[in-house]
């Protein structure tokens, strides 16, 4: 392993005589390229990215709260919001944080920057493992998505980035959840990131086991723009769509060690992945510096995964109470607390505060309800 290889070098060994370790990662998504950009932190390592040919994916906006381990992301942040809102039929709760603003970056820009840094640091790209000509001692990690069974909870969405007249949007406040939309198919909310007073990303997002027809999401966006935001004249400049499995899943290939979502990086209750992938990689590299072998584990604490399992059970069986759940949480927590909880940085006191904000009976029933994907 890396630590063992490093410890075997003698003081008189020249750089040319040092045996480099070969590491390959299958897939060229967020996790593998984020690690590749930091390959200089892996001593005496040749990193190979296995990138089979596949269609170019559309751009996406990734959202997260600013945290210490995300400092390297800051130069690519498209927009920061120190205020964000959770809106139900009964309340509009605006939270704010000076230290942990909500932020957004472009998927394409992040991956391009990581790839550029990786190439500068000698990372090589191949279309197959065979093409990499790895020796038998090479370590292989798999970033392909984990295995997902039918019927699991999904976060699925369609988004429009729109341009409207100046003054159409309040770009000081991100709308994380606006539940004033059709709830007939499951937990459903509108997510709006205003990049300026005329440009915004609006997503129709659902948490449910089944996806809806495209027209359902598109109508929800149009209705929200026209009836809630009072924006009827706009151009769609970009579209995005996606589906993220929520739960606890087996690795893509049980014979290979995982990285990223294939090593438990995706937060089961929210689908947030980008920030947690960076945390996972940070921890792995800290371990390497401490003399441990490179290894990727879930960045989530066991108690948070336990709480996530209960939450997913509630939302699966009683989606109609989702507005009440998130409205209560937003009203009881400060902006900093909200950001820390959803970023996996909660204290026990904060977790208790969240639990006490929840409706008790649905969560008690979920506590004793068996779920097939429980951790």
Model-derived segments and their meaning:
Residues 117-235, 247-252:
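Predominantly flavin-linked oxidoreductase catalytic cores and closely associated redox partners
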Residues 11-48:
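N-terminal Rossmann-like FAD-binding beta1-loop-alpha1 element of flavoenzymes
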Residues 192, 253-269:
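Short FAD-binding loop at a beta-strand-to-alpha-helix junction that anchors the flavin cofactor
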Residues 184-187, 241-259, 314-320, 327-334:
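FAD-binding beta-loop-beta segment adjacent to the flavin cofactor pocket
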Residues 282-375:
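C-terminal helical "tail/cap" subdomain of flavin- and related membrane-associated enzymes
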Residues 210-240, 257, 278-302:
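Flavin-binding catalytic cores
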Residues 262-283:
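A conserved FAD-binding loop/helix module that cradles the flavin
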Residues 34, 38-90, 109, 158:
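N-terminal FAD cofactor-binding segment of flavoenzymes
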């Amino acid at each position: 392993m890396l630590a063992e290889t490093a410890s075997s070098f003698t003081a008189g060994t020249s750089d040319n005589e040092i045996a480099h370790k070969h590491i390959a990662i299958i897939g060229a998504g967020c996790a593998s390229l984020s690690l590749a950009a930091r390959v200089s932190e892996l001593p005496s390592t040749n990193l190979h990215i296995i990138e089979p040919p596949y269609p170019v994916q559309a751009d996406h906006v990734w959202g997260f709260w600013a945290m210490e381990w995300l400092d390297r992301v800051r130069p690519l942040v498209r927009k920061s919001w120190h205020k964000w809102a959770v809106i139900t039929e009964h309340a509009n709760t605006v939270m704010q944080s000076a230290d942990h603003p909500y932020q957004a970056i472009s998927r394409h820009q992040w991956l391009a920057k990581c790839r550029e840094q990786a190439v500068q640091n000698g990372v090589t790209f191949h279309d197959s493992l065979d093409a990499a000509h790895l020796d038998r001692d090479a370590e292989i990690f798999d970033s392909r998505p984990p295995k997902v069974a039918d019927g699991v909870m999904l976060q699925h969405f369609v988004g429009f980035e729109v341009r409207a007249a100046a003054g159409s949007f309040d770009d000081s406040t991100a709308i994380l959840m606006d539940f004033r939309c059709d709830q007939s198919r499951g937990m459903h909310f509108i997510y709006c990131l205003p990049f300026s007073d005329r440009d915004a990303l609006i997503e129709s997002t659902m948490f449910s086991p089944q996806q809806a027809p495209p027209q359902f999401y598109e109508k929800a966006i149009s209705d929200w723009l026209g009836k809630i935001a009072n924006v009827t004249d706009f151009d769609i400049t970009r579209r995005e769509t996606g589906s993220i499995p929520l739960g606890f899943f087996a690795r893509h290939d049980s014979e290979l060690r995982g990285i990223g979502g294939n090593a438990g990086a995706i937060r089961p209750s929210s689908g947030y992945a980008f920030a947690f992938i960076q945390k996972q990689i940070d921890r792995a590299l800290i371990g390497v510096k401490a003399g441990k072998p490179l290894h990727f584990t879930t960045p989530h604490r066991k108690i948070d995964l336990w709480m996530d399992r209960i939450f997913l059970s509630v939302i699966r069986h009683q989606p109609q109470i989702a507005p009440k759940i998130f409205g209560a949480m937003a009203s009881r927590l400060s902006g900093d607390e909200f950001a820390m909880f959803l970023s996996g940085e909660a204290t026990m006191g904060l977790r208790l505060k969240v639990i006490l904000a929840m409706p008790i009976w649905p969560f008690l029933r979920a506590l004793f309800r068996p779920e097939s994907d429980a951790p």
